[in-house]
Amino acid sequence: MAVKDYYKVNGESIERLRQFCPRCGDGVYLADHKDRLTCGKCGYTEFKK
């Protein structure tokens, strides 16, 4: 997936479509799976309800 797919431009504002990893910080996105969000760098996982 290209970086351009992580953002949505609304006029002069930018909206992030993915969450950043809370452990790794800004610039490392969480992968959006069917039942969880996962960081590929550190392995952090959040399960969806």
From Swiss-Prot:
Protein keywords: Metal-binding, Ribonucleoprotein, Ribosomal protein, Zinc, Zinc-finger
Gene Ontology biological-process annotations: translation
Binding site for Zn(2+): C21, C24, C39, C42
Any single Gene Ontology cellular-component annotation: ribosome
Positions of C4-type zinc fingers: 21-42
Family classification: Belongs to the eukaryotic ribosomal protein eS31 family.
Entry protein name: Small ribosomal subunit protein eS31
Organism the protein comes from: Methanococcoides burtonii (strain DSM 6242 / NBRC 107633 / OCM 468 / ACE-M)
